[in-house]
Amino acid sequence: MKVLNRHNRKINTTPGIAASILDSLSGPEDRLWPHENWPPMQFDGPLGEGARGGHGPIRYRVEKFTPGKKAVFRFEPEGLAAGLDGIHYFEITPFDGHVLMVHVIEARCGLVMWLKWSFVIEPLHDALIEDAFDKVENRIAGKQVKSSLWSPRVKFLRNMIARKRRREEKKRAA
């Protein structure tokens, strides 16, 4: 089965500023990834081809990195992404005097993974990416101008994940 998920946002900024935001991804001064409310994107080295890592239980490696333009990640066959065969990427494109910021997932998977994607991963992913684009817009504006609301489903899923994490931590502490 095919998974195709696309988010884009027209950002009122210059290509140079957008490029520096993309290039900060997963670094100590990350201005794109919404690590304030989501697991941080981390790699075993700097953002560059071959670096391995991910965010939370989603594992991937950097397949291609074109500074200031595009970062392509290939899912690893482990963690929550096990069963997703494909890529996801961020891309910056000049557009009508602004910048179009894009995030795309293109993957294939079996039925079980597709169900997991549809009911659990996709709603969380969608909220995370919208939070990332909000972070960029707010940073550029220098104030809070955009704040996407999480759906009741996203709030429920985040609550269930947090409860599971607390139970696992209690077991390890015992």
Over which residues does each language-model region extend?
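Hydrophobic pocket/interface hotspot
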Residues: 17-28, 62, 73, 101-103, ...
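Short beta-strand segments that buttress and anchor functional surface loops
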Residues: 45-55, 72-80
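Hydrophobic secondary-structure block in the mid-to-C-terminal portion of proteins
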Residues: 138-174
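A short, structured loop/turn motif at beta-sheet edges
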Residues: 11-16, 63-69, 91-102
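Hydrophobic ligand-binding cavity/cleft-lining segments
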Residues: 1-44, 160-174
